[in-house]
Amino acid sequence: MNKTNDIDQLIYLFSKLPGLGIRSARRIVLYLLQDKDVRLKSLINHLIELDKKIVKCEICGNLDTKSICHICSSEYRDKSTIAIVETVAELCAMERSGNFKGLYHVLGHNLSAASRQNPRILRLPELLKRCFVENIKEVIIATNSTLEGQTTAYFIIEYLKEHPAKISRLASGIPIGGELDYLDEGTLSAAISLRQPCE
């Protein structure tokens, strides 16, 4: 593979990152390569270090440098409430809102009616066990307002019916098809505060 193809391949890989298209990816790659001894090597070294240090939290699925993340191990969190999010990006969005002080359960996936995914990918048995063991009083379903997020939410509501915890959903204000990671802090904070019980 010649150098031009190598650069094109790197641009293609960057363009697969969320929020980046070919043009943005090209700008990033060319920026990194213009001063590769400083920019590119620094990025590579940081990525290698992250790869060695970052693990999934054994309890919630968050990413951290410890096997029990800083949220699950914090004595200042409300241990009676769990918010169910699809990915760590949504967890970070909830944290940025500053309005949620409970714990999380990161699904890692969502369910698509079209793809017929196995619901086991959602780690729901672990969630149900946490609800009983940790005496959870409220479960907030904070999946995205996409079709897949709604499908996942309805499946979770059915799955958790045997547990006595209050089950609620983020309030309206989140547009249909919207993803939590793209909402401003004020909108997300209001959606958390005005969450609605699921019936």
Curated annotation (Swiss-Prot):
Statement: the UniProt record of this protein carries the keyword Transport: no
Segments forming C4-type zinc fingers: 57-72
Intrachain disulfide bonds: none
CDD domains linked to this entry: TOPRIM_recR
Start and end residues of each Toprim domain: 80-175
Family of the protein in this entry: Belongs to the RecR family.
Protein name: Recombination protein RecR
Organism whose genome encodes this protein: Rickettsia prowazekii (strain Madrid E)
Gene: recR
